[in-house]
Amino acid sequence: MKIKIDESYLSKLEQLALIRLKNEEKDKISNDLQRIIDFFEKINELELKDVEPLFHPISSGKLRKDEPLKPLNRDEALQNVKRKENGYIVGPRTYGE
């Protein structure tokens, strides 16, 4: 089924997204959406009947064995820290002044 992004379809998308587009935005978005839809239609045309589905793109994992290392002591951990205070790392404020 060929989907065509026309004025009514775009208007419905505006309502669903709760947005209002300007006319110049409508033209650009309409063209972009049509290109995306066309791309997915090309994907749908692929013959995949004999292709076995993959659960992961890499068939065999090459994982390294976990080996515990000696933990850093406090001085080593704070060695490259820009801001520290009383043996703790001081990070940037994320809330308030």
Curated annotation (Swiss-Prot):
* BP-aspect Gene Ontology terms: glutaminyl-tRNAGln biosynthesis via transamidation; regulation of translational fidelity; translation
Q: Coiled-coil stretches, from where to where?
A: none
| UniProt keywords, alphabetically | ATP-binding, Ligase, Nucleotide-binding, Protein biosynthesis
- As recorded in UniProt, its EC number(s) are 6.3.5.-
Keyword Heme assigned: no
InterPro entries of this UniProt entry? Asp/Glu-ADT_sf_sub_c (IPR036113), GatC (IPR003837)
Provide the function of this protein: Allows the formation of correctly charged Asn-tRNA(Asn) or Gln-tRNA(Gln) through the transamidation of misacylated Asp-tRNA(Asn) or Glu-tRNA(Gln) in organisms which lack either or both of asparaginyl-tRNA or glutaminyl-tRNA synthetases. The reaction takes place in the presence of glutamine and ATP through an activated phospho-Asp-tRNA(Asn) or phospho-Glu-tRNA(Gln).
Q: Which family does it belong to?
A: Belongs to the GatC family.
Which HAMAP family would you find in this protein's record?
Answer: GatC
The identity of this protein, by name, is Aspartyl/glutamyl-tRNA(Asn/Gln) amidotransferase subunit C
Q: Which gene encodes it?
A: gatC
